Amino acid sequence: MAVYTDVSAASLSDYLAAYDIGTLVSYHGIAEGVENSNFLVQTTTASFILTLYEKRVDPADLPFFIGLMQHLAANGISCPQPVAMRDGTMLGTLAGRPCAIVTFLPGVSVRKPTAANCGQLGRALAQLHLAGAGFEITRRNALSVSGWRPLFEAAGPRTDTVHPGLAAIITEELAAHEAHWPAALPAGVIHADLFPDNAFFLDDTLSGIIDFYFACNDLFAYDVAVCLNAWCFEADGAFNATKGRALLAGYQAVRPMEAAEVEALPQLARGAALRFLLTRLVDWLNVPEGALVRPKDPLEYLRKLRFHRAVASARDYGLAA
């Protein structure tokens, strides 16, 4: 979450009049994240999250995001619920941006996940994959392998200003993945961005999942690979196989992976690291002036990518033989 677009108290109060959720008491921007402008809004009835969808979000995708949260909640996943206006509309416009209000999900994210946290996350991810079955709207993953070269081109010659030799590494990775990216694996709705700040815990129990604005249809095992990258590395860049083992065991307890998924996991994890390296690189080089946003270090994912390049099999991630 982040804030790129400011909202005045007067305009927000006027906007809330279209809802039956009380009147504005207070609000403030949320700096975490990188994609949209988000505000915690307190009204006379409850707390809510207001999201303004910024220019990188295609308005045509918004019905997918809104509908998916409704579908997942109806199928047992704890996630924010879109709030309808009095006329039943879920999407509005504020400060020149498409926007939506969703319910506030209680809980806190963990900054240093434990193996137990990772195990719960694995189970929740598998439950999400199963719950997505039957959701009729689809959205392609614009940040899968076909979208990585355009990101690299957007960074352009400035790439090596972030790290000497980075452009050559990315060029090599793109060639490898474009030639051999797995395709014929189980697929469906995935979260695609399930980092620790998008999972909430209460009393060490996972209480919900948020931020579905990268969700799409893609390989389930790719979503697992994203989570291995996001949850199982330590601050010094070392992969924690105990956490990896817990995450994978939690996932497999709910949705056992096929042999082909297990075999593809090293390449999927390597590709996921490249994806976040590239998006962080572009964001790092293009922070809007005055935006309340903390760009994330792309080199964190260069270090992870180097680990994945040395992986021999899924056993290196802690997967039981």
From Swiss-Prot:
<dbReference type="InterPro" id="IPR011009">
    <property type="entry name" value="Kinase-like_dom_sf"/>
</dbReference>
<comment type="pathway">
    <text>Amino-acid biosynthesis; L-threonine biosynthesis; L-threonine from L-aspartate: step 4/5.</text>
</comment>
<dbReference type="GO" id="GO:0009088">
    <property type="term" value="P:threonine biosynthetic process"/>
</dbReference>
<protein>
    <recommendedName>
        <fullName>Homoserine kinase</fullName>
        <ecNumber>2.7.1.39</ecNumber>
    </recommendedName>
</protein>
<keyword id="KW-0418">Kinase</keyword>
<dbReference type="InterPro" id="IPR002575">
    <property type="entry name" value="Aminoglycoside_PTrfase"/>
</dbReference>
<dbReference type="InterPro" id="IPR005280">
    <property type="entry name" value="Homoserine_kinase_II"/>
</dbReference>
<keyword id="KW-0067">ATP-binding</keyword>
<dbReference type="GO" id="GO:0005524">
    <property type="term" value="F:ATP binding"/>
</dbReference>
<keyword id="KW-0808">Transferase</keyword>
<keyword id="KW-0028">Amino-acid biosynthesis</keyword>
<dbReference type="Pfam" id="PF01636">
    <property type="entry name" value="APH"/>
</dbReference>
<dbReference type="GO" id="GO:0004413">
    <property type="term" value="F:homoserine kinase activity"/>
</dbReference>
<comment type="similarity">
    <text>Belongs to the pseudomonas-type ThrB family.</text>
</comment>
<dbReference type="InterPro" id="IPR050249">
    <property type="entry name" value="Pseudomonas-type_ThrB"/>
</dbReference>
<keyword id="KW-0547">Nucleotide-binding</keyword>
<keyword id="KW-0791">Threonine biosynthesis</keyword>
